[in-house]
Amino acid sequence: MKSLPKPLYAKHSKRAVLLLHAYSGSPNDVRMLARYLEKSEYTVYAPLFTGHGTLAPQDILAQKTETWWEDTKQAIHFLKAEGFSQVAVFGLSMGGIFAVRALAEQP
């Protein structure tokens, strides 16, 4: 049986990058970029948005965009609680929308 996607967190240095996946995706969407950044000594965190990466595809339909925005804010808070004063944010597709919102609302 195939395993379900999980958040990706790799702590390396005081430079942190938050990677946000696409709608109906998972941290696997940004795994290659995460590995590249890790090799360059960046700390990388790619959370799993609520309702994504489950055995029941309809779980995603039960969520609202504000839930995913809260997931994004929690991810930023997690990295700041880990001691990172500056967090770079990148997103793919839907994740890109939340990345831009994060940069606009939490510069």
Where in this protein do the model-derived segments appear?
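Short beta-strand-to-loop junctions in surface cap/lid or active-site-entrance loops
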Residues: 1-15
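The serine-hydrolase catalytic nucleophile loop
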Residues: 24-35
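Conserved alpha/beta-hydrolase
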Residues: 38-57
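Catalytic nucleophile-loop/oxyanion-hole region of alpha/beta-hydrolase
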Residues: 55-83
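Alpha/beta-hydrolase fold nucleophile elbow
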Residues: 83-92
